[in-house]
């Protein structure tokens, strides 16, 4: 009960603090609360669009009704809407249509004047209301996903939304705070950093915590056979079925780098399994002194300059930390592979077809060149082979 009462006290103070910094909160706003356990997608409730004092009463009534005084949810986030703005639906569609990626729209959207149907930015992407099928096709609002999200979110029946019939919507920014370890942590508002927590005052401790937590996550994603759980789409928590050699190796390299900060002996069995998985699955020798890392689906296999570089960075970092040269011969053959992709003038070739080694793409990604140079330098530090 004491924790519950302290939570409400702090929330009241935070709302009082916010109102002094946002002039338009004296007018209409919407309060959102996102909450849930660690192993489940959060639920999101919001007040009516009304004055802050009335919205605050509605929020606290909801908290008293839904939360147990003896046990708060694991995750709680509060959003306060401001800059509520009526915009033409066509204007919003065009903004989304012309964005380079499908997750760059940073505002919440209400789909009627009273905002009885409203979604935060994070809900819009978490429920795939805005989608992009591929990098070269325009982004769009998915009507089926929107209406499915409405049915999931609201207890009361809402009319189905037909996007072609929409004339206007109400967009908004939010100020937000995240409740963790008995305190409220302010989150950034607007633009690229929207919804991201500010850096703690002790930056060294903050960054160390980030490194340790991300290392633990990477380690947890390595399966027994050494293959990573590649990732999840945030909408519907679906597994990403693709796999990528460069990301396998760079993820391992990143995990190995964390040993500069912390020595986790319990990580080694999975790290070794993941290195072995890379060498067994992707490593192919062209001749006795030259090797390449392959990538892609069966029938579309290719050789990437960046994949060889990433593998060398992974293997040399392992040797640097452990002092063991178990994988040195693999790194040296991969280095010969890189040299085959660099002409006498220093110009690189980025992608070959496998297994005929003919040109697929002269240039693909700008960082391949720097990655390859760094990999060769890291190997030179170990074997001094000019």
For every predicted segment, state its role.
Residues 186-238, 260:
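Eukaryote-specific, low-hydrophobicity, charge-rich regions
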Residues 313-385:
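Active-site lining segments of carbohydrate-active enzymes
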Residues 227-244, 287-310, 348-371:
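Carbohydrate-binding/catalytic loop surfaces
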Residues 155-162, 209-227, 268-289, 328-349, ...:
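Long, well-ordered core segments of solenoidal/helical folds
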Residues 48-209:
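Extended, non-transmembrane interaction/recognition domains
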Residues 42-79, 255-258, 262-276, 281:
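Post-signal peptide N-terminal segment of secreted/secretory-pathway proteins
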Residues 189-204, 249-265, 310-324, 371-385:
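Well-ordered alpha-helical scaffold segments within catalytic/enzyme domains
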Residues 2-47:
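Charged, amphipathic alpha-helical stretches
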